[in-house]
A protein has these predicted regions:
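An N-cap/entry alpha-helix motif that binds or orients negatively charged groups
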Residues: 36-97
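Short, Lys/Arg-enriched N-terminal segments with co-localized hydrophobic residues
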Residues: 25-35
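Alpha/beta enzyme core
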Residues: 77-301
């Protein structure tokens, strides 16, 4: 975590001692967590990830293959088929035609899961991210097109407002702060629209409290009982997000503002376990730690 400018680990501690003590502590935390979590029907439906062959492949335990790989794809409403992202050489924003060609190439390589992230034109952004609720936006069009052309592909859709807001935050601003409960209502609307457009998996990345339960409730009430929720359960306020924010076009809107009031403090491991346990109880089928590489202790826990 020194890459996150961490200064909370005393230099006199040896790496070996930290690793040894952490291993025992993590095991204890894990066993406590298992007994803490209470998964109940209908928020939890264990058949959900068994409902389709490609979902069973994605969540198969003790089996490592291309079925475990998910390819992020950035899309934009643009005339050019591909536009390279400056901060990520070799990675492109695609229009719909290029998206379909890229997906076909991935299928030929054995990769059957794609995660769609939009770059939205500045003139379509506003305070509440209203374009996220337009059923003709680029994400909804992409999901429908992928479902028609590649029914065997798992389509993962990001649930968050930051690509659509003119301030770059993941929710509604009230007196300069992101209002949690107003944002939940908008995330419900966005999630339902994405499910109606053909998303197999919804991935809320916003880090609002209670978002998983809110999304699960709206899905259940509209008979989308098999739509999987992949929660960004432990999403840290990380320095690593710069290239991604450039890719979706939110960095200019966010400017020097911080997301630390809703994304997690990188010093906290116990909090990650609480966040994960809560999301599972609220109805998440899959959970994620983000970033991953620099947070392997959190993944291990």
């Amino acid at each position: 975590r020194t890459l996150e400018k961490s200064k909370f680990v005393p230099k006199k501690w040896s790496a070996c001692k930290i690793q040894e003590n952490s291993s025992v502590s993590i095991k204890r935390r894990y066993h406590r967590l298992i007994f803490m979590i209470k998964r109940t029907y209908p928020h939890t439906r264990l058949r959900r990830t068994r409902s389709k062959g490609y979902l069973r492949d994605l969540v198969a335990e003790n089996n490592l293959s291309t079925n475990d790989l998910i390819q992020p794809i950035f899309i934009a409403d643009q005339s050019d088929k591909q536009i390279e992202i400056p901060s990520m050489p070799g990675i492109f924003r695609h229009n719909l035609d290029s998206l379909y060609a890229e997906t076909e190439a991935l299928i030929n390589k054995g990769i059957k899961s794609v995660a769609i992230f939009p770059a939205i034109d500045a003139n379509k952004k506003d305070q509440k991210g209203s374009h996220a609720f337009d059923d003709k936006n680029i994400v909804c069009s992409a999901l429908k097109g992928l479902a028609d052309r590649f029914p065997e592909v798992i389509k993962i859709a990001d649930v968050a407002l930051d690509p659509y807001t003119d301030h770059g935050h993941d929710g509604v601003l009230l007196d300069g702060h992101v209002d949690n409960d107003q944002t939940l209502e908008l995330l419900q609307d966005q999630a339902l629209l994405l499910a109606q457009s053909g998303a197999d998996i919804l991935a809320p990345s916003d880090m609002m409290d209670g978002r998983v339960r809110a999304i699960r409730d709206i899905l259940e009430s509209h008979a989308f009982v098999d739509t999987v929720i992949l929660s960004y359960a432990a999403k840290y306020a990380s320095s690593f997000y710069g290239p991604f924010r450039e890719a979706v076009g939110s960095s200019a809107n966010l400017g020097k503002a911080s997301k630390k009031t809703y994304q997690m403090n990188f010093a906290n491991l116990n909090e990650a376990l609480h966040e994960t346990a809560m999301d599972i109880e609220e109805g998440a089928d899959i959970v994620m730690v983000k970033p991953g590489t620099a947070y392997l202790d959190v993944v291990h826990a």
